[in-house]
Amino acid sequence: MAALGVVAMIAIGAGIYFAFFGAGPQVTYVTPDIVPINLSTTAPSDQPPVDLPSAVLLPVPFTPQAPLGNWAARQHTCEEASLVMVDRYLRGDHSGALIDPHTADAAINQITAWKPAVDLTIEQVGEVANKNLGWAYQVVPADRLSMKQQLALGRPLIVGVRTHGLGNPNYPGYSTHFEQPGWSVSHYLVVTGYDQADTYVLNDPGLTRGHGYHISFDQLMHAIDDLDQAYPNLNAGRVFLVLAPAV
């Protein structure tokens, strides 16, 4: 079968992203500016837009959690990779491109040194980002409206899942050791957008080609629930983390 075409155009900052993937319809994504988190008041600037865009895509740069290919030594660095992606986006890298592997690896090593444990709860991920990277954070219920609201505020979402729960057959052991301990593991990734078909876009650092993976809302919720059932020490329920500058 011939390869299907992909056409995309993006405007940096607040703008519009036109995308055509395969034989489906063209999707027109908007790219909102980042709205700071107001920690002292529910200021209007921190409230979700009244009219949500039908589709949002944030051009968050990507790195796998093993940017130099050393996966055996990078089994527990999904938190770091997720933070690297979001941190670079908040600091102005709206390229949506692959981060230089050596730059990403050095940043992952730095965040590893800051981690209080090998595997972190979502609250601990926020605390690491706040203490060491200077970002305000909020833990938000992972329902459709809240996810779309936060993305429409220009904030990527960091989500805790279990890998096989994502339904992505590219994960090791998906077809041979489905949902078995040691194969389907706790994991963090970044949600960068949504469209009118209730599809969400992921930057998944657990795969070398995890950039721009599309997943249904129900499948994403299943992956979150799967984490909570298999890893009760990380159980926070259906929630996600957002980072942004504080005002």
Regions found by a protein language model. Give the residues of each.
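Extracytoplasmic/secreted envelope proteins and their assembly/folding machinery
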Residues: 75, 79-87, 105, 122-126, ...
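Secondary-structure boundary/capping residues
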Residues: 95-96, 138, 156, 200
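Predominantly the structural core of cysteine protease catalytic domains
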Residues: 115-188, 192-194, 234
